[in-house]
Swiss-Prot record:
Entry EC no(s): 2.7.1.39
Species classification: Bacteria, Bacillati, Cyanobacteriota, Cyanophyceae, Synechococcales
Predominant subcellular localization, coarse grouping: cytoplasm
Species whose genome carries this gene: Prochlorococcus marinus (strain MIT 9215)
Protein name as it appears in the record: Homoserine kinase
One Gene Ontology molecular-function label: ATP binding
Subcellular location: Cytoplasm
Amino acid sequence: MSIPEVGKKIRVTVPSTTANLGPGFDCLGAALDLYNEFIFTRIEGGGDRFDLIMESTDGNHLRGGPENLVFRAAQKVWENANIDPFALEARVKLAVPPARGLGSSATAIVAGLIGANAIMNSPLSKEKLLELAIDIEGHPDNVVPSLLGGLCLTARSSSQRWRIIRCDWHYSIKAVVAIPAIRLSTSEARKVMPKNVPISDAVTNMGALTLLLNGLKAGNAELIKEGMFDKLHEPYRWKLIKGGLEVKDAALNAGALGCAISGAGPSILALCKEENGKNVSQAMVKAWENSGVASRAPFLNVQTTGSQFSTISGK
């Protein structure tokens, strides 16, 4: 396979994600309509050159060297396609804030995989890209919906293969995501979790996840209320989020059906009917303000098409 000509450009648009949704720890996630955009250009030079150009002052978490997630993902494509690495420039327009529990690292991984693959006319299948994305991230709950879109449940089968189920999300259920002006790294959020949990907590979570998925499919408010809670990770993580429990209580009191930490946090996801959305959003922002934390709480629709790419031009 030939290396693409210098000047070839590919645009990749990758949605943010909210993972876990309460009981779906490390297996459930949904794509949201907040996006990072990446433009990849084949430039002069060898595979040790990777230029990263940011178009956001909030993008300093993405580094431009070989340790960068975009570059690491591109390298995986080259390795699996048996291609000699070549120089790439990635121009990134960031809208997904880093370290907020909205899958910013997943957007970098997915963009690197899709961009490097597309610029070579896609030698790797989408299934292979999914496998590589999960391998790089270490868990599937963000990268799978980021690549495929929608609400995705991903689990290892008895044969140790990853199985992905696209789950239904009823149109009447809306998402409000309260995004604070504070950061929390995934590694920090994982450190506080115990290595073992009581079997009763695991059983409770399995039941809650079943209720939640059926509630989201049918738009059944009662099932969502009864299913959107967690025993495996949230009891240990709330203490890391300043004012988080107060924000959750405010959302529920304002009419939210359920409330959960988005991914590793600190953002908080609330599900509600459309008529309650404005009150829920305002209540969450106000509760964080009372704790001395600035925030915003936009409506974010579930994005169903996943990551998209297009060729911009040649030289």
